Amino acid sequence: MNLLTFLSLVTDDTSVALWDDYKEQKIKDYCKRDQISISEASRYEVSFFTADCKGLITIFVH
């Protein structure tokens, strides 16, 4: 699934951490989902994600 589509399912106040699935390294942290630009989100496909009860979603992309 494209990251842009995935983010449309996430609430605005959710923190997001993007990780490169292949390199296994963090790309960037965002305090709020809407801080990720459309052009950046369009570049990635979601491999899988994890979520915690504190409002953080870690998304592994390629």
How should these model regions be labeled?
Residues 1-23:
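N-terminal acidic leader/helix
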